[in-house]
């Protein structure tokens, strides 16, 4: 994960979430994305997180910090973020975009039921390098009873 890209999302959105997951290490999130960050050192508390993210104190003052402890990767904020989940559906990228509230969103279609899922491609920027260099990236959708979530996995 490219930490500087995550920091840019935090500064832009004013929100930083750190989840300590017992069976999976540290995850970093924004209001609309969450990233596995197991390559980072264990960090607890605002001061350690700010230091690891290398954010100036003045910029950090504008960020809402949320820290959580979760029991399993299968239930982070009620979502199963394990490598594979029963019932996940493959998707295909479409040449369609939409701009709800002025934010351009890319589109993927579920291969099973044809449902369209719009998401902000910019939220994948911390993973862009890994996505580009990976031989195997699979985009799937998982439904948890609420709204769909799109995942990319290597």
Model-predicted regions and their roles:
Residues 1-154:
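DNA polymerase processivity clamps
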């Amino acid at each position: 994960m490219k930490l500087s890209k995550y920091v840019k999302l935090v500064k832009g959105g004013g929100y930083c979430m750190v989840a300590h997951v017992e069976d999976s290490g540290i995850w970093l999130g924004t209001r609309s994305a969450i990233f596995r960050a197991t390559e980072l050192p264990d960090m607890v508390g605002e001061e350690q997180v700010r230091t690891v993210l290398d954010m100036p104190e003045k910029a950090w003052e504008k960020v809402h910090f949320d820290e959580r402890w979760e029991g399993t990767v299968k239930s982070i904020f009620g979502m199963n973020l394990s490598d594979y989940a029963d019932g996940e559906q493959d998707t295909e990228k479409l040449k369609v975009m939409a701009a709800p509230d002025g934010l351009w969103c890319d589109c993927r279609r579920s291969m099973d039921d044809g449902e369209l899922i719009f998401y902000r491609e910019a939220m994948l920027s911390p993973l862009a390098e890994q996505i580009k260099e990976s031989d195997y990236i699979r985009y799937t959708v998982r439904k948890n009873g609420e709204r769909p979530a799109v995942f990319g996995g290597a």
